[in-house]
């Protein structure tokens, strides 16, 4: 018999999953629609498509693990799931990093030659860095996952105790996240400095009146700030989710930590939708039509 708290956590997890499913689905459809309309992939559309696709996969992995985690305690399934999960998670982080670099390229305003050179070169240079680093990281992740995993012996149960070697295993698999996270923080910091500099100029010339560039700065920083907060929650909740599944498993703790984790791919999709005016207006129209239809057919 499920307790009230556990049932509430399951309900929250399902709601988050549905929100992310709709949000990421809307972003994928919008990206393809823009491609069909213009017959050309822009950098922004590719980033949004990759980000939404990775979040979509990450959501399903979390829900799959949450629903069937007892079956994944065997060495084979845990190993393969861990490798795929880490690759999808790191790909999602990389696309978010590219989004922050893209915002820097399009929005950042600096007059110094060094910053102008960095603005022109950093985006194209980071494309090659992403490709090379991601290929190396995929190979290392697969190699670590296939050779480092040593399941405990002498226990026929599917539940294995969480030992110290598994901390090192998880640490090595996630070691590829440090570089993109650093690039993300640097580019976000440059956006903050650019916003501060631009605000000082506008305050001196237009009595503090907000303009389109300042609004673009704030929209970008809101998106990046929400991503950073949700990603940190996801990273901090991951080890607790792993330890809560050890024998004997604590279902309440499992649902608490994985509900926090699923908020990362789900809620950030809404933040991205709110930052794209055309998608935001379309979603508002659809919601309004749904409300009107419900009122017409309701009692």
From Swiss-Prot:
Topology of the protein relative to the lipid bilayer: Multi-pass membrane protein
Topological domain ranges for the Cytoplasmic compartment: 23-45, 104-127, 197-223, 275-299
Residues in the Extracellular compartment per record: 1, 67-82, 149-175, 245-253
Gene Ontology MF terms in the entry: bitter taste receptor activity; G protein-coupled receptor activity
Glycosylation sites: 155
Signal sequence coordinates: none
Protein keywords: G-protein coupled receptor, Glycoprotein, Membrane, Receptor, Sensory transduction, Taste, Transducer, Transmembrane, Transmembrane helix
A cellular-component GO term for this protein: plasma membrane
SUPFAM superfamilies: Family A G protein-coupled receptor-like
Transmembrane spans: 2-22, 46-66, 83-103, 128-148, 176-196, 224-244, 254-274
Alphabetical list of Gene3D superfamilies matching this protein: Rhodopsin 7-helix transmembrane proteins
Pfam families found in the cross-reference section: TAS2R (PF05296)
Localization per Swiss-Prot or TrEMBL: Membrane
Its job: Receptor that may play a role in the perception of bitterness and is gustducin-linked. May play a role in sensing the chemical composition of the gastrointestinal content. The activity of this receptor may stimulate alpha gustducin, mediate PLC-beta-2 activation and lead to the gating of TRPM5.
Note, other: Most taste cells may be activated by a limited number of bitter compounds; individual taste cells can discriminate among bitter stimuli.
Entry similarity comment: Belongs to the G-protein coupled receptor T2R family.
Name used for this protein in its record: Taste receptor type 2 member 5
Organism: Pongo pygmaeus
Taxonomic classification: Eukaryota, Metazoa, Chordata, Craniata, Vertebrata
